[in-house]
Amino acid sequence: MIRLQLTIASVIAVIFAGGLAPTARAAESVTYEVASSDVGTASGIEYFDGARRDLLQNVSLPWRTTVEIANPTSLGTDGAEVRASWSTGRLNKFVMVRIYFGDKVRCENALDLGNAACYGSTPFTTAIK
């Protein structure tokens, strides 16, 4: 009887452990883009590469890179994110930052204030359609 109870307890433990284990997800292809017809160089571009945040300085525009991210829509520090900063000293010098999930635009933001950002957690656009 004790052997049967131990066997049943073991089977139940295995079932629950498998049911509660996190499901592995394949990384998604995420493309970051920073472009402008008004500004030739971004003083800084910061983005999450799937493992850590990278900061590039004095980057010629347009700039684009593709990375693999396990959870690009995360609200945490492991989600897709791109920021660009620039300084022209004048208004109406727009820079556009974009995040693509595959070939679909997830976020795009155009600003002339010297700093623009996009986050994979938030579908967003400033484009006029």
Specify the residue positions occupied by each region the protein language model found.
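Noncatalytic modules at the cell exterior or secretory-pathway interfaces
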Residues: 26-37, 75-84, 129
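Extracellular, modular beta-sheet/disulfide-rich ectodomains of secreted and cell-surface proteins
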Residues: 27, 33-59
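Mature extracytoplasmic domains of secretory-pathway proteins
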Residues: 48-95, 101
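C-terminal partner/receptor-binding element of secreted or periplasmic proteins
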Residues: 106-129
